[in-house]
């Protein structure tokens, strides 16, 4: 079970794990953001990376067993779809006091190690996670060409304990 990194009083059950989360309604406009990229050090804004086809925003972290379980498939899918013009960006909003392995330096090390083909951004204030109603990792948001939410949820049915890759 992944730890929650946001709090909201309006909760609904999230099917990916035992963590409850709110759900950004389908059709919602993507919340704008400008966050530091832990790999290259520059600031990334949503409007600068958004694709005219689709944009995938992922809330992940280094320590979550669910993220670790899907990392290989995530990299494979991202490489495949980036080649087709789909934009990908990952964001970590974890509290580094409680999870020091999720700090910016460790994020960069992890991104290089697993060969993330997308920016890995650090949301220190957790304001971006709150704007997206993200509550656990991994959490995936797919926005259409107009940055309207088309999908929110899990990558697939796999999890560390079910034997599905």
Model-derived features: where do they sit?
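Chalcogenol-based redox active-site neighborhoods
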Residues: 2, 16-165
């Amino acid at each position: 079970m992944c730890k929650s990194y946001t709090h909201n009083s309006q909760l609904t059950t999230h099917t990916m794990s035992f963590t409850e989360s709110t759900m950004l309604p389908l059709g919602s406009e993507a919340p704008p953001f400008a966050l530091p990229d832990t790999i290259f050090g520059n600031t990334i804004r949503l409007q600068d990376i958004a694709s005219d086809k689709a944009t995938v925003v992922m809330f992940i972290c280094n320590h979550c067993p669910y993220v670790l379980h899907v990392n290989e498939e995530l990299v494979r899918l991202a490489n495949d779809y980036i080649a087709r013009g789909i934009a990908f960006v990952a964001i970590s909003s974890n509290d580094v006091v409680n999870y020091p392995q999720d700090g910016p330096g460790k994020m960069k090390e992890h991104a290089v190690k697993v060969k993330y083909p997308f920016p890995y951004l650090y949301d220190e204030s957790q304001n971006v996670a709150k704007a997206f109603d993200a509550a656990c990792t991994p959490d995936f948001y797919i926005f259409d060409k107009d940055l309207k939410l088309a999908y929110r949820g899990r990558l697939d049915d796999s999890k560390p304990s079910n034997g599905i890759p």
